[in-house]
Curated annotation (Swiss-Prot):
Glycans are attached at N40, N75, N84, N122, N138, N227, N252. The gene is gI. Interacts with gE. Its main location: virion. This is Envelope glycoprotein I. The lineage of its organism: Viruses, Duplodnaviria, Heunggongvirae, Peploviricota, Herviviricetes. It comes from Cercopithecine herpesvirus 9 (strain DHV).
Amino acid sequence: MLLWYTTASIMRYLMVFMLFGIQCAAAIIYRGNYISLYVNSSATSIFLKGNNNDASIRGRFLFIGDQFPVTNTYNVTVELLHVNQTTLCLQPLYRVMYGECPRIRTGAIIACRVKRSWHYENATQLTDPNVEIIFKMNNTKVEDAGIYLLVVQLDYTSLFDIFFVSLNVYPKQDTSNEDVNYFPPVYSPSHILNTFKICHKFPVHNGMEQSILQHIVTSDVDTETENLSWQKDDLGSTQKPRKNFNPDVKVNVTHETRKTLMESSADVFMIAVPITASLLVILAIIIVVTVGIYRRRSSEKRKIYRPKRTKEQASTEKRERSESDVLLEAAVARLETIQEENPPHSVINPFTK
């Protein structure tokens, strides 16, 4: 019985663990040319209900296969842009530069010693892969729904990788938002890079250059749009660099490389993580082992334990044993007497008078 309860408890915890694993199975790995992106989900949804309408997508960057950097440290730039479906342009939101990032196994952009970031105007979106935040937005509005681009470039390559994340925003149940399109638009990466243009030119400001995408989009910059400024977030770092860090990113991408980039980097290779299948296999193995142990223990011969006797039971058994011994001794004595009085081969019942 104890084994049965133990097995039931184990099964209950395994079911909870399996459900948690199924929930996490939505994780996806996007493989780029020089760096890969692991996200818990390719899209996130938020329901507007109060003052705290924050949205975030957690994940981290990885080095897979031949993507490992050749040096012990490297610098990297990450830009966050929003696909504006109204004006058909790419709206720059946030830019962060990491310096002196150590090469730590498969982890990318981890424990970087230098960080410099800029916000675009009053944008509330940001990305901070150093703390496993791929996308974060505060005070989300219905108009913020859509597709966001993460452009990542390492300092030892002239090309870059582009990753896409989507945000769904569901408004409150009222009539004021009925005409608002709060679902992300359906655009392919190649269509975005071929059709969309940069909404605003990136100003040169304290080590900043124009957007990495500025070199690759086919359309010219919208010069009629007001050139808004960047706001400095944090310049420098909490630690002193061990060597001179140049935050400027030298980009040598030209229009001739656009076609190659479209074929290799825009349509990233997606790998589904088979967490659910692994959990089911582990669960099946544990069930088989548990059932085998239960059957083996059930087939073993159980020990028979006599219950403890009370004093009254012991005295009664002793008295009955004494009476039986007396009767047995009397019968033996009677048998010996009969054998002496009668011939050896005579048949006489010793218990008759």
